[in-house]
Amino acid sequence: SKNVQYTYDPSKPYGERITSLLVNGAPIDMNKNYTVGSVTFLLAGGDTFPALTRGTKTVLGNLDRDKFNEYLGAHNGIKAATLKQAIGVTLPSDPVAPEQEFTVPLRGLSFSEGPGKTQNVKVSFGSVAVNASVNNSLREEHASDEASIITTDGAGQATLKASLPMSVCAAKPEGGALTLPVTVETDFGTVVPEASGLTVQVTCPVAAQQPGAAA
């Protein structure tokens, strides 16, 4: 559904990889019940979706093929989506220091076919934006094993190299930890909004005291 967005971190252990899940632009409420519609294969836990087996099933008796064709017939001129809704983001697990270089691997930024192939990605850490080119190649050495990237997570990869300027710590002259929100944009729009809650921790040094200032 176009009202659902999520992020995942493929470097995390199984069961901990989903790092955010938004419905209608807001984080899901763990105290609410949600209705999920899909084919029986996925609802039975296929493709490693075991969480879908925990709900109460309602079988409608329709074939996905028939409903898909009905939808296309009722929506003349429908166009393929360009904005991805599932993005792989691996952020530093430890705090970073200003001017310290770190990398942010990204996956699933593009569709494998059609108009939704982004050429660029922008990752913002608070007000600091860093840009990178996107690799949309479908060639993959590990296409059929667990080291797969494209087969598992889709096309559109980038490894962003970033370092944050000392100015990010201007609001924290006393030093200590600073939390910066992380957002991700492609050529087609925002794919990881601030509401996703992804962050980077920055360790700010104590600001140097100006000559003549009172201690």
How should these model regions be labeled?
Residues 1-214:
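Catalytic centers of hydrolytic enzymes
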